[in-house]
Amino acid sequence: MDLILNRMDYLQVGVTSQKTMKLIPASRHRATQKVVIGDHDGVVMCFGMKKGEAAAVFKTLPGPKIARLELGGVINTPQEKIFIAAASEIRGFTKRGKQFLSFETNLTESIKAMHISGSDLFLSASYIYNHYCDCKDQHYYLSGDKINDVICLPVERLSRITPVLACQDRVLRVLQGSDVMYAVEVPGPPTVLALHNGNGGDSGEDLLFGTSDGKLALIQITTSKPVRKWEIQNEKKRGGILCIDSFDIVGDGVKDLLVGRDDGMVEVYSFDNANEPVLRFDQMLSESVTSIQGGCVGKDSYDEIVVSTYSGWVTGLTTEPIHKESGPGEELKINQEMQNKISSLRNELEHLQYKVLQERENYQQSSQSSKAKSAVPSFGINDKFTLNKDDASYSLILEVQTAIDNVLIQSDVPIDLLDVDKNSAVVSFSSCDSESNDNFLLATYRCQADTTRLELKIRSIEGQYGTLQAYVTPRIQPKTCQVRQYHIKPLSLHQRTHFIDHDRPMNTLTLTGQFSFAEVHSWVVFCLPEVPEKPPAGECVTFYFQNTFLDTQLESTYRKGEGVFKSDNISTISILKDVLSKEATKRKINLNISYEINEVSVKHTLKLIHPKLEYQLLLAKKVQLIDALKELQIHEGNTNFLIPEYHCILEEADHLQEEYKKQPAHLERLYGMITDLFIDKFKFKGTNVKTKVPLLLEILDSYDQNALISFFDAA
C-alpha cells in the first residue's frame, strides 16, 4: 500500500532548535491536538486549528533562546505539562499557558538537551550531565566529549533509573547514578535518542538513535550489555538525523518510525514480519527538520505527521485528501469552505501589502532625517562543517532563516570544490594571487530565489592547513553579510575510529619535553578533527584515527611530558613532526623528537593506494576515449565493429563523465600523495630527493605497481 500524505503549512514562528515542538495529548482518540513550540526569540506558543486557521491558545513574552521543549506530568497520566530549557533555566507551563515552575539550575554552560520522567529531570550542557529529582540535585557526570542528547529508559516499566547520553565521540554512555555502567560504540556521532514505540518497545529497553552522518539504529540497553537489533545505513547519502518519533501513520495497528533530517527529508519506516524497518514514504522540505511528531492537528480523524523546520515553519503532512469526492448536494458546501479560505487569504494579503507600504514610507522619512542611524539587521545562520567518510570530502551546509542572495567562499589553503547534486546555485570563480595575499580560492555562489539552504563539498590536502571563510549575504535590506570561519587542520582527512589494526607496519614519532597534558592536548586538537576541545579526564589518553582518503591509520597516545604517535603512513608522521615542532617553538618549549621508521610501511601504503590509482587511471582513459568513439559512431552509422570494451564505454558514457566531473583533481591528489610519500621516506634518512620527482611522475604516467615499488627501493 502506498502512503499518500498532503502538505499543509500552519504558521511560522522564529528560528527553532532541535526537539522544540510537541503535540499536547488529545482528550479522545483522533481528536485534534494543540501544537506547542518554542523558538530562538524565547517565545513559547501554543495553537490549535479552527476552521482551517491557526488560533493561539497562549503565547509567552520573548526571552532567552529556547534550546529544548518537552512534555511531562505524573507517570501513567497524560503528559500535558510543558517544560522548556532556556540558558541555564527550566520553566514549566500548564497547557493553558500558566507558568508553574521556574528552576534556575546554576549550570555554568547553557542547557543543550533535556528529558523529563515524572519528577525526574535529566539535563545536559555541552560536557556536563545533571539529574534532578523534585528540583534537587541527585547525580552528576562530566563527559569526555560533547553530549548531543539525553534520555532515560521508562522508569514505570523497568523500576530503575537508566539515563543514556549520546556523545559526539561516537559513543552512547549508559549511566547508573553518577557512574558509567557501560559505553556503547556506535557507527557515527549520535545526534538524537528516542524510546522505540515511545515506550521502549516490548522490553522497555529498546532505544532508537540517529547519527549526524544519517544512520539510524535500534539497540536494547540491558543491565549488563547492549544488544544491537538493526541498523539502517545512509545509502542514499541523505542528511544527518535531527528528530525521531513513533506513530501509526499507515493505520495498520503497528507504530511506524518517523524521521526528520537536516537536509529537509522526512521519512516514514514501517516494520515487516521480521521487525525490520522498510521505507514507506519520504518527502523533501526545503530546510532542516528540527522536530517531528505524529498526531492529529488539522482536522478530526485525519492522522498526520507534524514537523517544525529551522526557520520556524510548522507543517503538517496529512492523510486528509486534497480532492474530495462528494455526493449530490454536497458540492456547494465544499465550494463555500474553499471560498471562505480564499477570501481570508485575500484579506491577509491586502493587509500585508498595506503594512509593507506603510513601513516603506516610514523608512523613507526616517532615512532622510539628520538624526537617523542605520541599523544592521541581524539574522541567524545554522552551519555545519563535517567530514564524509565515503568520499573523503567536507560538507559545508549553510542555512539561513531568510532567502540567501549569495555566498562568497575564500580559502588561504589549496582546496577543491566538488559537485553537489542538490546545489542549484550558480558558481563563479575569481582569479587569485596566492603568493601576495594567501588567497588560494575565491568562489561566489549566486542562489536562486527563495533558497534558504546551501550545501557545498570541499576536499582539502593533508599537510596544508589554514582557514576557509564563508561570507553569507541574505536577500534583506540594507545589505548585510555574516562571516563564518572553518579551520582546515593539518591532518584534515582523518576521522576518529574505535579500533585500528595493530598488525600493520607502523612508524613511530615520540615527543618528550617540559609540556603539560593540556598543552599536548591542544596541539592534537590543532592537528586533527573530531578531538574534544577540553582535555579528557585522567593522566593519559589514546585516540585512534583513520585516513578517509587512503585508509591508513594513526594512533595517538599522550600524557604530561610525552606524546607517542604511530601510523602506517610515513607522510602522516612527517606532517605531525613538522606541525608539532612548529607549535612547540611558538610557545618556546624545547621538544626532544625521536622517530622509528619502518621501511615495510612504504610498500604497504603503496599497496593501499594501488586500487584507487588504478581505478582513476582507467576512468581517465575511458573518458578520453568517449569523444573519439562518439565521432566514429556518427561517421560509421553503427558500432557493431567495435570490441565489447568500447561498446561498454559508449553505453556508460554519461555515467563515466559525471563521475569524472564529480571528482576533479582526484588523480592529481593521488600523484601528490605518492610524491609526498617518496620525499618523506628519504627526508627521515636525511636525503633530499626532489630532483628525482620528474622521474617518479614519468613512472606514474605509465603506471605499473611493481615498477613503482622498485623505483622507491632503488632510489
UniProtKB/Swiss-Prot annotation:
One of its GO terms (biological process) is positive regulation of proteasomal ubiquitin-dependent protein catabolic process. Signal peptide: none annotated. The BBSome complex is thought to function as a coat complex required for sorting of specific membrane proteins to the primary cilia. The BBSome complex is required for ciliogenesis but is dispensable for centriolar satellite function. This ciliogenic function is mediated in part by the Rab8 GDP/GTP exchange factor, which localizes to the basal body and contacts the BBSome. Rab8(GTP) enters the primary cilium and promotes extension of the ciliary membrane. Part of BBSome complex, that contains BBS1, BBS2, BBS4, BBS5, BBS7, BBS8/TTC8, BBS9 and BBIP10. Interacts with BBS2 (via C-terminus). Interacts with CCDC28B and ALDOB. Interacts with SMO; the interaction is indicative for the association of SMO with the BBsome complex to facilitate ciliary localization of SMO. One of its GO terms (cellular component) is membrane. This is BBSome complex member BBS7. InterPro entries: Bardet-Biedl_syndrome_7_prot, BBS7_GAE_dom, BBS7_hairpin, BBS7_pf_dom, Beta-prop_BBS7, WD40/YVTN_repeat-like_dom_sf, WD40_repeat_dom_sf. It is found in: Cell projection, Cilium membrane; Cytoplasm; Cytoplasm, Cytoskeleton, Microtubule organizing center, Centrosome, Centriolar satellite; Cytoplasm, Cytoskeleton, Cilium basal body. The keyword Cell membrane applies. Pfam families: BBS7_GAE, BBS7_hp, BBS7_pf, Beta-prop_BBS7. The modification N-acetylmethionine is found at residue 1. Its main location: membrane. Keywords: Acetylation, Bardet-Biedl syndrome, Cell membrane, Cell projection, Ciliopathy, Cilium, Cilium biogenesis/degradation, Cytoplasm, Cytoskeleton, Disease variant, Intellectual disability, Membrane, Obesity, Protein transport, Sensory transduction, Transport, Vision. GO terms for molecular function: RNA polymerase II-specific DNA-binding transcription factor binding. It comes from Homo sapiens (Human). The gene is BBS7. Isoform 2 is ubiquitously expressed. Isoform 1 is expressed in retina, lung, liver, testis, ovary, prostate, small intestine, liver, brain, heart and pancreas. It is linked to Ciliary dysfunction leads to a broad spectrum of disorders, collectively termed ciliopathies. Overlapping clinical features include retinal degeneration, renal cystic disease, skeletal abnormalities, fibrosis of various organ, and a complex range of anatomical and functional defects of the central and peripheral nervous system. The ciliopathy range of diseases includes Meckel-Gruber syndrome, Bardet-Biedl syndrome, Joubert syndrome, nephronophtisis, Senior-Loken syndrome, and Jeune asphyxiating thoracic dystrophy among others. Bardet-Biedl syndrome 7: A syndrome characterized by usually severe pigmentary retinopathy, early-onset obesity, polydactyly, hypogenitalism, renal malformation and intellectual disability. Secondary features include diabetes mellitus, hypertension and congenital heart disease. Bardet-Biedl syndrome inheritance is autosomal recessive, but three mutated alleles (two at one locus, and a third at a second locus) may be required for clinical manifestation of some forms of the disease. It comes from the Eukaryota.
